[in-house]
Structures are given as structure tokens and as C-alpha cells.
Amino acid sequence: MQVTVEKKEGIHCSLLIEVPANEIDSVVSKEINRTAKTIKMDGFRPGKVPAGMVKKKYGEQIRMEVISDLIPQKYSKAIQDEKLAVAGIEVELKENKEGQPLKFVANLELFPEFEVTGFEKIEVQKPVVELTDKEVKQMIENLRKQFATFSEVDKVVEKDDKVTIDFVGKKDGEAFEGGTANDIDVIIGSGQMIPGFEDGIIGMKKGEQKTITVTFPQDYQNKDLAEAETTFDITVKKIQQAELPEVNDEFVKKFGVKGGVDTFENEIKENMQRELKFILQRKVKDQVFKGLREIAEFETPKSLIKREIDAAKQNLLKQMGGAKGFDVNQLPDNLFEANAKQKVETSLILDSIMNSQEFKAEEAEVESLLDELVQAYEEPEKTKEQIKKNDKEIANLKALVIENKLTDWVLEQAKVTEKTEDFFEVIKENMQAQQAGF
């Protein structure tokens, strides 16, 4: 086999590979003879079909099957010999004739080689959130609202009321698509409608009609409406007032708590603290990764981005329960491209840093992280034992420990400031970020 490096520019490289004719023809001949012994053909007894007849009828097909098997073997050997770190490959067949060398080009995308410097340029705003009894009481109040019962009342609309409404949305005086609905239930203050909509209903009475003006958010999914000033003609058809359950032993049993109200309140606070810790870690880590992407200079292999896009599509299909009749591949790649590119770049950067630094996940550190994570489950010890039996899960935990160490290492060199934030705003932002990332 002869290998010629045709061109190597940045992360792109082409290998011209030539396989001697006798090697190809020998394998093809053996395959034809093997086929002749098993194939059934009219006029011949089984195993007695002449090889020449097989070659005449199936020779081209057999040759292509042989080549399809041989090409990956040959380019894999060439890549190994040339010591290339390949991210993606496309094969272009050049010459394929009996009695002549097989020639093909392997167009390669390589993993970029780069060093990350300038960590001091990274700016991170570290959120500081104080979790007090006030936030715990508010969380319990939110849980009470989830179990609220509603009864119709004759009064003006107030916060936390459930109202049944009709509305017609208009932009520049014309009704827009998706902006009209009838008999829609809205809980005032829930945030289920765009900002300003629910506030505009407060003070209205049953049977009252009113036109309100609201501006759609900048990041609204329908770009034709993003930042657009619109009007909504609203009719209130029913007003219902919420009746919240008392926080007693019967109420806390709905959440699987057996120790009474005090135990319930303690568990709520612990859950809030645990969730807050992970969210704040994620917020800081996201800023660190964003900063790393900004200072690192390299070309991102498109094949890796495409691979990540395909994985994101399959993950979406899985989240939808493998929806029958839905072809996820019909979704355009650009819906997933930005997130996919970020993931690939972040992964390449972290790998580059870890190659130059010695971050290790000690067994005690993995155990500590596992202990912390399983507290979110109903049966922590049982869950812990199940995870410890799963090699893949343990590998993921080790990777997370190393990732956390790397993040702390970058933070020691970055410009870090602190910003006080509200607990519920942080939770809301986290939910929005998760939804935006599919």
C-alpha cells in the first residue's frame, strides 16, 4: 500500500491511498470462488456453478463489497502510520478497475492542536444568594398553590385568581396567527402569559371587555413578534378565587413526608439548599466555559459539530418518548447548531487544558460527590449502591469531579466579582435556560 499526504492545512488533511492491483484482485477472486460454492443458479447443481459465470453476473457487485470492507482497513492503517488524530473522514474513490491499483482519497478533519492561555482575561460574576426562612415560607406557599381548589366569586380580578377569558391579539391593528383564543384559564401572577398580560387583567370584572397594550419579549420564539408592541382585546368570562390547603400532617403526607410539619419544613429547606448549590455551580461553570471559548483560538471540526447535532436530535426524540410518525431528522440542523458548536468547543478546550494539567479524581472525592447527589432521591442508600455498580455512571462522576477541579483552577486566575441575586429569580432563569437548550 502506498500513502501520499496530498495536502495538510490547519485541521484538514488528504491522504491519497493506492492499493496494489494483485491484492484487490486476489481478494475478489477468492470471494467469487467462495460465492460459486454456495450460490444457486438455473442449470447448475448446488456448488457446481462455474466461477466465470459468477464473475460475469455478480463480479462487479462482489468487487464493490470487497472494496467497501477493504477501504476502512486501509485508511485506518494509513492514519495510524501517519500518527493523525482524526475527528472525521470522507472517502472519495478515484480509480477502481480490474488489473489496476485501487486508488482513493481519504479527506480528513483532524482534532485541532492548541494551547489555552490568557485565563486572567476571563470575567466571572459569581452569584450570591441568601436562603432565609422567608424563601422557605414562599416555597411552601408555592406548594400550597399547587393543591389549591377554586370556587367562582363575584368580585374584581386579583392576584392568584383563576380567570376564564377570551382574547384577540393584534399587531398594527391586524389579528396575528396564534393570538386568538377562547375559554382560556389563566392564574393571575403565574407568569404563563407574556409580561404585562396578566397584570392587565387585574381589576376587571366578569363580563367586562378591555384592550391592553403589551410588548413581546426580545427572546420570544416567534421572531415576527419579538419586541413587537401589540394589543389584546380581553373578555373576562369567569373569576375563581383560590382556596389553599392548610399546612398540616395531612398536607405533608402528599409529599411522602412522615415526620410531620417540622420535618417537612426542614426537608424543603435542605432540598432548596441542594438545588441552589448545583444551580449556582452551573451558572459559574457556564461563565467559565464561555470565557474559555472566547480566549481559545482554534478551528472547530465540522464533523464533530454534525455528530453533536445528530445526538441532540436523538436526545429530543427520546424526550418525546420516541414519538411515532415523527422524523426528527426533518428538523433543520440550524436549530441545534449553536448549542452543538458550544458543546464541541468546550469539550476540546477542556481536553486541551487537562492534557497540560494533572487533574485527578480521588476515590474519596467521587464518593463525596455521589453522597451529595443521591440525597435528592427517596432512597439515597439504595440509589447509591445501584450507581456504584454502574461503571458508566462512576466514570461520569469522575469526569464531573475533574471538571469541577478544572473550573476552580481557572477561577483562581480569572477576574471574579460577586452579585447578590434572588433565589426564585435564579430558579426561574435556570428553568428557562433548560427549556432553551431542549
From Swiss-Prot:
EC number: 5.2.1.8
Residue ranges of domain PPIase FKBP-type in the record: 160-245
Places the protein is found: Cytoplasm
SUPFAM superfamilies linked: FKBP-like (SSF54534), Triger factor/SurA peptide-binding domain-like (SSF109998), Trigger factor ribosome-binding domain (SSF102735)
Entry GO MF terms: peptidyl-prolyl cis-trans isomerase activity; protein folding chaperone; ribosome binding
Reaction(s) this enzyme catalyzes, per UniProt: [protein]-peptidylproline (omega=180) = [protein]-peptidylproline (omega=0)
Name of a matching Pfam family: FKBP_C
A biological-process GO annotation: protein unfolding
Gene Ontology CC annotations of this record: cytoplasm
Sorted UniProt keywords: Cell cycle, Cell division, Chaperone, Cytoplasm, Isomerase, Rotamase
Broad class of where this protein is predominantly found: cytoplasm
Domain of life: Bacteria
Top EC class of this enzyme: isomerase
Domain notes: Consists of 3 domains; the N-terminus binds the ribosome, the middle domain has PPIase activity, while the C-terminus has intrinsic chaperone activity on its own.
Function comment: Involved in protein export. Acts as a chaperone by maintaining the newly synthesized protein in an open conformation. Functions as a peptidyl-prolyl cis-trans isomerase.
Database matches in HAMAP family: Trigger_factor_Tig
PANTHER family assigned to the protein according to its UniProt record, in alphabetical order: TRIGGER FACTOR CHAPERONE AND PEPTIDYL-PROLYL CIS/TRANS ISOMERASE (PTHR30560), TRIGGER FACTOR-LIKE PROTEIN TIG, CHLOROPLASTIC (PTHR30560:SF3)
UniProt-recorded name of the protein: Trigger factor
